[in-house]
């Protein structure tokens, strides 16, 4: 049943969904190997978001059971968002996709549970709470595809052990599903997996090492099969000797060079490989002791002679390097096979998207699509449920950094004692005089702190925080960035917030904010200051320490991620009255008005800060001078429900006791959208709109009396 109680997890879930949906503005999202899982999460998010908004606006609040459901779903949404934001091109794609797929599956099941709980409470809710009904929402979530590449990989590994596979069709499916669409990506994956396997062997983790060995074999077969396909495509009267073909380009070489491992590659391709920070031989997967490229005159001479004899003209490597090589393994036949078996995801996705876009106005459309696709999805669901369970856990993905790799396997699990032992060793490494040692230690702690609450507690208990704080002044850009991110991850734990602040982190964090080497470091410094400012006493301390001006600078000139983190921090700091004037004097209003352009995807963040600043005289003046009134009116008319609410609150503050602003706002045509808001806005939005309209009426009557 529904009772009146705090709805904190409901709001957290709504905020998390909004943050997740905002990922659609990321430039590199479409190239993410797990993009299709983002789309599935987006479909669920767009379905549940209006339900949550209406639930917040209603008089009913969730029961404890439902609040628990919101909490679980909020955590899955946030974890999924973090995974998409943390994607790095030079990390293992297979494990990344498997992790995303696992979270996407949990998200789907958790959202089903939430809708089922809401359905049980439906009689306690207003009749017009949502459209379509909860039953229809349940059916829509069930339509979200749940085919699993993890099942395909498990089967491929089993077939591999039996010596009967995998088939080319299976290789294609794995490659396409994990974003391994070029020979270079396949080779990178093999190198990353090999490094992870070596780390597993060092820790005597035989189960993990065996699993990784199977995946390495799969990537090797992908490379070999792609090589065979490429050989068949070469228009040569005779077969091209393998020694004349570059393992990276799969083409005839024109400028063969030797690397430190003794292997020969086409110069421009191996140079690109090294320039990416891959200090490992693509063929042998050995570490390269140096980057010198030695011309292989012998191979060049033999190659020239062979080409002349066989009348073959090698392609221009400079043209090849700028073109991407797709993975051409029978793609059409695989898609045709999937379609025959009822797994044509593109059709399901298209139909489902139509339902999501039309369901609010035409709920009857749901049953039509449900009936049409339920049988097909059941087949996929049945097969996915039969996949074998394995006790092995995903290792954390590996991130590559120039000039080498970080040789630390990241686990998601581990006993508290083993983690504590490792953390103590890492803390000693943080104090090392070797930058390489410090770099590896901060990178490892960063991952540990991100992975679990228990890890964050252990890291803080082992007194890692003071050492991390001191590294904020490091002259090594990677160490500094990872140290900041470690503190950000640790600050998720409320007790750690105080430990971080009491370790003197505020001033060093501001130092990074001002002078950080990487945009990532500046953005995460802003995010950490926001996290600390949740505690009331630190709002004043952060403001007095000089954080506001660099936060405003980041708001104006930082990356999009940095702008968002700066806006969030400024919002929290501006709640404290003494900080409002500092934010205004630092020039934040101009940037906030600029960021209300929908192209930035920051309208809601900018508006809520302006609403805070509009409560003081200096803020009102600045908003008026910087052209904030027209954009606030535009948000009232065209913004999201939350955006309209906060824009109206800001306009109400501007107009109160200011006939000049009142006239300006009216001239911008705000009255029609305000009237509409009184009928369809959030509860607070309706209240603010009604108050503003009343104020306009009183203002008009006052003018008439004076006239």
Curated annotation (Swiss-Prot):
| ARM repeat start-end pairs | 453-492, 494-534, 536-575, 577-615, 617-656
Keywords carried by this UniProt record: Repeat, Transferase, Ubl conjugation pathway
Q: Which domain of life is it from?
A: Eukaryota
EC numbers on record:
2.3.2.27
A GO MF term = ubiquitin-protein transferase activity
Entry-linked SMART domains: ARM (SM00185), Ubox (SM00504)
The reply to whether Repeat figures as a keyword in the UniProt entry is yes
Pathway per its UniProt entry is: Protein modification; protein ubiquitination
The leader peptide range reads none
Pfam (any one): U-box
- The answer to whether the entry has keyword Cell inner membrane is no
The reactions it catalyses are: S-ubiquitinyl-[E2 ubiquitin-conjugating enzyme]-L-cysteine + [acceptor protein]-L-lysine = [E2 ubiquitin-conjugating enzyme]-L-cysteine + N(6)-ubiquitinyl-[acceptor protein]-L-lysine
GO biological process terms on file: protein ubiquitination
Q: Which InterPro entries match?
A: ARM-like (IPR011989), ARM-type_fold (IPR016024), Armadillo (IPR000225), RING-Ubox_PUB (IPR045210), Ubox_domain (IPR003613), Znf_RING/FYVE/PHD (IPR013083)
Which Cys residues form disulphide pairs?
Answer: none
Question: Where in the numbering of this chain does the U-box domain appear?
Answer: 239-313
Top-level EC class, please?
Answer: transferase
User: What's the stated role of this polypeptide?
Assistant: Functions as an E3 ubiquitin ligase.
Which PANTHER family does its entry note?
A: U BOX DOMAIN-CONTAINING (PTHR23315), U-BOX DOMAIN-CONTAINING PROTEIN 2 (PTHR23315:SF263)
Q: What is this protein called?
A: U-box domain-containing protein 2
Which gene underlies this protein? PUB2
